[in-house]
Amino acid sequence: MNVARMWTIARLELVQRLRAVSWYVLLGVFGLILLGVTALSLLAFGGWAGGGPGIFSVVVCVTLLLVLLVSPTLSGNSINGDRDAATLAPVQVTLATTGEILIGKFVAAWITGLAFVAVAAPFLLVTMIVGDTNLAAVAVSLVIVVVEIGVVSAIGVALSGILARPLFSVAVTYLVVAALAVGTLIGFGLIGSAVSSEAVSKSRSFTYDLRGYPECTDGGDDCEGELDRMACGEWETSTYRVPRFDRVWWMLSSNPFVILADATPTTFDDSGNPDDVFGWIKASVRSAQIPPDLAPVWDGCDPAVYDGGGSDYRTPEETIAQTVPSWFVGLAVQIAFAALLLWWAWARTRTPSRTLPPGTRIA
């Protein structure tokens, strides 16, 4: 492949976008939304000690959300739109190969998406100045956002080469993005709830009379707090169904927001709680990896439990430490899927073409 020819294709695509007034309007609306989000985040986290990481994570998540909503429109008609406008065929008869055309349009779509990150840069800088933001978290989160923009751009360009109608390819690109961002959550919840297991729990506690006083083993009526004299009830058994999210947690690994949160380094406060949105998302997703207890036992007559101890609660920090990251697997799946679609688009766009969809314009 010739880099100069690929850049020429990308530059032509970018020049067409720069000439459109709607492009600048879209960037302006994007900036206004981020301004409002940043202001609200400052109000929400400003009263917290060390609220900078929380503000930064909110702005980054909203930036990724907005780019995911905009990118399908910018890349979903790159090839079939040119075919409808009769501008693809003149390019195909030049020295530019099909692969160079595809890569050039992909690079242009990626750069276009990065323009929105550039608009978000001042707001991200403000959030970094406001609080003590972890520089490692800043660097990793921005890299993941840039890569996710590239993945969505590649999917949109590929679908525009696979499908003949621009409107249809844009719609399918939106569906793919929705499947990754929302469909994975829905599938995780529904399948995890459907794939359930039976749990049998046992519990017992001290017995109390009608006045609310504990019953005493020696027949007395004043044994409050004397555990060796308080009467303990019989064991009670109950059976119920427990969702098995630990069997389907991998479905979330390809979610763009889960990848972003899981890859970003997390810092914790003294109680083991994350100091940003990334950490809370990571802890929530990682907790799904832990199998549920199918035979729980609660002994209210145990002195440790009676005194308020015996809890098996895990802090988010402990949950993250006991589980494994999955962001690199999800990102690899996304990249492989985008690469497969690009190969399919190359096969559909290459010339000479043996067959074309009915009604396809070639010149």
Model regions: which residues?
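Transmembrane alpha-helical segments and their membrane-interface loop/helix boundaries
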Residues: 1-11, 15-22, 28, 34-36, ...
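Alpha-helical transmembrane segments of multi-pass membrane proteins
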Residues: 15, 19, 99-116, 120, ...
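Secretory targeting signals
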Residues: 38-39, 44, 57, 63, ...
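Long, hydrophobic alpha-helical segments
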Residues: 55-86
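Hydrophobic alpha-helical transmembrane segments of multi-pass membrane proteins
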Residues: 59-66, 75, 142-147, 329-336
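Hydrophobic/aromatic residues in alpha-helical transmembrane segments
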Residues: 68-75, 155, 341, 345
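Helix-loop-helix units of permease transmembrane domains in multi-pass membrane transporters
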Residues: 74-115, 349
